[in-house]
Amino acid sequence: MTTRNDVAQMIDHTLLKPEATTDDFKALIADAVRLGTYSVCVSPSALPVEVPENLHVATVVGFPSGAVKPEIKAAEAARTVADGAEEVDMVINIALAKEGKFDELEAEIKAVRDAVPAPGILKVILETAALTDDEIVAACKASENAGADFVKTSTGFHPAGGASVHAVEIMHATVGGRLGIKASGGIRTAKDALAMIEAGATRLGLSASAAILEELGE
């Protein structure tokens, strides 16, 4: 049985609203400590942030559209690592997946991977709601070939939607057991979170962490 604390240690407690202030990020960190989440995920401009030793720091690159050149994403990623990010969630150039240019997609991810050396963690946001099932599979394979640590469903900002159980199942069937799988975007209830975990998610990107963990109880 998945406990409340099990779920907490799968959560990237997230604040990526463009209008978020320094005080908002401080409150996010305080909440994460109180809730016992695995990490906080903050905007690159918020870095560096002060966190206790047992709380990890994640950020985003090429966010939210992914529509910038690979070298720009790599430079942004390198700067976030220099600013203390331990985990980087990059958004792919979705057009490359839609056009079937998976060699180019792999090269893009590899460029960011090189900017986030181990022990840094690289998560690749596929924006699965905008992709077909076959495109999700191919994008997962490109991510694995490029050396990513995780594949991730969504930014939470795309009009096509956020995470779905179906997408997580496809990702798990493709790279589960070799790469982590992060579900993010539109996960607002404990039922949602548990469904994603059941489908194969090993990490959750949540802004509703407090409400979900309260629902799960002790």
UniProtKB/Swiss-Prot annotation:
GO biological process: 2-deoxyribose 1-phosphate catabolic process; carbohydrate catabolic process; deoxyribonucleotide catabolic process
The organism's place on the tree of life at top rank: Bacteria
GO cellular component: cytoplasm
Catalytically driven reaction(s): 2-deoxy-D-ribose 5-phosphate = D-glyceraldehyde 3-phosphate + acetaldehyde
Compartments in which it is found: Cytoplasm
SMART domains: DeoC
Keywords: Cytoplasm, Lyase, Schiff base
Pathway: Carbohydrate degradation; 2-deoxy-D-ribose 1-phosphate degradation; D-glyceraldehyde 3-phosphate and acetaldehyde from 2-deoxy-alpha-D-ribose 1-phosphate: step 2/2
An MF annotation (GO) of this entry: deoxyribose-phosphate aldolase activity
EC number: 4.1.2.4
InterPro entries: Aldolase_TIM, DeoC, DeoC/FbaB/LacD_aldolase, DeoC_typeI
Pfam families linked: DeoC
SUPFAM superfamilies tied to this protein: Aldolase
Residues annotated as the enzyme's active site: D89, K152, K182
Function in brief: Catalyzes a reversible aldol reaction between acetaldehyde and D-glyceraldehyde 3-phosphate to generate 2-deoxy-D-ribose 5-phosphate.
Family affiliation: Belongs to the DeoC/FbaB aldolase family. DeoC type 1 subfamily.
Protein's name according to its UniProt entry: Deoxyribose-phosphate aldolase
Lineage, opening ranks: Bacteria, Bacillati, Actinomycetota, Actinomycetes, Mycobacteriales
